[in-house]
Amino acid sequence: MSNSASSFADVSSGCTAGTPVPADSPIRDNIADAVRRVRETTPLAQSFTNFVTINLVANAQLAAGGTAAMSFLPDDVIETAKIAGANYINVGTLLPFYKDALPEIAQRLNYLDKPWVLDPVAAGIGHTRTAILQTFKAAPPTMIRANASEVIALANMWGLNTETVGDASEHRPAGVESVDDVESATGAAVALAQYLTEQHAKHSSHDASTRCAVAVSGIADLVTDGETVYRLPGGSAMMTKITGAGCSLGGVAATYLAVSDPLTAALSASLLYNRAAEIADTTSHGPGSFQVAFLDALWNVTAEQVAESEILVQ
């Protein structure tokens, strides 16, 4: 392991407290199964993502073993959603027509009972983005993948976060970067996961006992289904030096959502990314070679390596 990888791992583990998930836990079996199923079945996950990172999103989905489709017009998205296993919406770069298109797409996905992942990039910045994200409360996703500031901002926006100290305007992303640590987003993440689960239980034809999930990326990732909070130490600081690491994680989470329940999908995608980043860090020499090595690691890392990663219950 390189110096940067080892130092990041030390910081990641050091800032996280919790009880380790046992090696024989069914959670680990579910994660390994999800990784294998994606590689065996190559599920289609459709993405409505931003222009800056669209290439990495597609390549990461392919490297994880899935199939990618990038769509933007509502009729294209809805028709593709009928054959896709899951869908992904990322609001990182906006065009004027998105203000009408994205709410329509979200409503149709929910009407068709199609699972989808939301990445509320830069939540809290700009009236158009805020208006779009507010409409998703009435047509919520199955999973949310975001950084800590975005999770806090979205929970405040939806009137769900009662644990944030101070005015909601204080908790805003700096562009697409988080200004809050993962720990501070715990209450918001739990509240969002509970809300998503409640709404899908009312309107979905799927098993009402299935819980939705929220994944918060950071030094030690957090994943919750609204009942249990998991922390996932690991990864590499180099992930912050390539554009689209978080966006592509959302796309891969959608790939896993096509073959598994939301919690398993969120855990599997986050752990896959952490393990692949650690492997890539040992052979790369900078951001360019790291991105190439990272995609190779997504392709080569085994289901067992992913499932054996450190998982803590908070």
Swiss-Prot record:
GO molecular function (one): ATP binding
SUPFAM superfamilies: Ribokinase-like
Keywords: ATP-binding, Kinase, Magnesium, Metal-binding, Nucleotide-binding, Thiamine biosynthesis, Transferase
Coiled coil feature spans: none
Residue stretches of biased makeup (Low complexity): 1-13
Catalytic activity: 5-(2-hydroxyethyl)-4-methylthiazole + ATP = 4-methyl-5-(2-phosphooxyethyl)-thiazole + ADP + H(+)
UniProt-listed GO biological process terms: thiamine biosynthetic process; thiamine diphosphate biosynthetic process
Annotated residues for binding of ATP: R145, S217
EC numbers for this chain: 2.7.1.50
Region (Disordered): 1-24
Positions bound to substrate: M70, G244
Family: Belongs to the Thz kinase family.
Protein name (database record): Hydroxyethylthiazole kinase
Pathway: Cofactor biosynthesis; thiamine diphosphate biosynthesis; 4-methyl-5-(2-phosphoethyl)-thiazole from 5-(2-hydroxyethyl)-4-methylthiazole: step 1/1
Superkingdom of origin: Bacteria
Cofactor or coenzyme needed: Mg(2+)
Physiological role: Catalyzes the phosphorylation of the hydroxyl group of 4-methyl-5-beta-hydroxyethylthiazole (THZ).
Gene: thiM
